[in-house]
Amino acid sequence: MRGSIMILLDEDTRCLVQGITGKQGSFHTRQMLEYGTRIVAGVTPGKGGQEFLGVDVYNSVEEVTEEMDVNASIIFVPAPFAKDAAFESIKHLDLVVIITEHIPVHDSMQIMEYASRMGKTVIGPNTPGIITPGIGKLGIMPTHIFTEGTIGIVSRSGTLTYEFAAQLTEAGFGQSTCVGIGGDPVTGLGFVDVLERFEDDPGTDAVVLIGEIGGDAEERAASYIEQMSKPVFAFISGATAPPGKRMGHAGAIIEGGTGTASSKREALEAAGAVVVDRPSAIVDEIRAQLGVR
């Protein structure tokens, strides 16, 4: 049996899509269904009673939970309405994946505070989501670059996740689960949360951590990596970024001498992680560390 509760997505995950009738929601719902994800309902206020690709659409999350067993949600709702959508999911469901970007920081803070109070798990916002190859995905990642295996990936960057996954797949290293934690300053699950799950997951033999400049998430991850029994390989993007300039993500900014690529690299290496300078170097390092050719 593939999958594990430790890594968030398994055969028992039954998901609804908030914003299923919108452009992004409808496109990615089709992709998720084709990959085998169990999408059991959609939610768009005012569109209840409709159907999309055989999936019934409801007006609210509560309506869905009254009629069927569902335990996860993925949100494609526009930023101004994302907080209300997230609150609705967090109230009723265990796992909420927020794809939406440009959510105001104050809204994100309220979402995370509510999720913490309710004991629920949030991935994102501004995330590509999560994929467990061979099981399903709750997200927007291109599925053809992923394959089943034992390498876990946790990342702040969607596109770099794809680059590393493609490198691993081409070299014959499949992935257990890949989690995008999101590129915003305020997110749900962080590096440490996901690393803990990978450490406990029998289906994961090693982990690739993809960080970037800004904040201290990688430094906090390093403090946990010291305790891990599984090898961790890391990459930090933004090494050439000038201080004070935001690079791509809202969270990718160096301020006050903290959050630099060099400080993150030093912390990770001191914790025992193998840090590479470019995605193409990851395969050789994994081969060397795991003793495979």
Curated annotation (Swiss-Prot):
Pfam family, one: Ligase_CoA
Keyword Disulfide bond attributed: no
Known EC number: 6.2.1.5
Catalytic reactions of this protein: succinate + ATP + CoA = succinyl-CoA + ADP + phosphate; GTP + succinate + CoA = succinyl-CoA + GDP + phosphate
SMART domains named among the record's database cross-references: CoA_binding (SM00881)
Active site per database record: H249 (tele-phosphohistidine intermediate)
One GO cellular component term: succinate-CoA ligase complex (ADP-forming)
Record keywords: Ligase, Nucleotide-binding, Tricarboxylic acid cycle
Protein residues bound to substrate: Y162
Binding site for CoA: T21, G22, K23, Q24, K47, I99, T100, E101
Any GO BP annotation: tricarboxylic acid cycle
Pathway(s) this gene product operates in, as recorded in its UniProt entry: Carbohydrate metabolism; tricarboxylic acid cycle; succinate from succinyl-CoA (ligase route): step 1/1
Stretches of the chain forming a coiled coil according to its record: none
GO molecular function: nucleotide binding; succinate-CoA ligase (ADP-forming) activity; succinate-CoA ligase (GDP-forming) activity
PANTHER family: SUCCINATE--COA LIGASE [ADP_GDP-FORMING] SUBUNIT ALPHA, MITOCHONDRIAL (PTHR11117:SF2), SUCCINYL-COA LIGASE SUBUNIT ALPHA (PTHR11117)
Function: Succinyl-CoA synthetase functions in the citric acid cycle (TCA), coupling the hydrolysis of succinyl-CoA to the synthesis of either ATP or GTP and thus represents the only step of substrate-level phosphorylation in the TCA. The alpha subunit of the enzyme binds the substrates coenzyme A and phosphate, while succinate binding and nucleotide specificity is provided by the beta subunit.
Record-stated family: Belongs to the succinate/malate CoA ligase alpha subunit family.
Subunit description: Heterotetramer of two alpha and two beta subunits.
HAMAP family membership: Succ_CoA_alpha
Name of protein: Succinate--CoA ligase [ADP-forming] subunit alpha
Natural source organism: Methanothermobacter thermautotrophicus (strain ATCC 29096 / DSM 1053 / JCM 10044 / NBRC 100330 / Delta H)
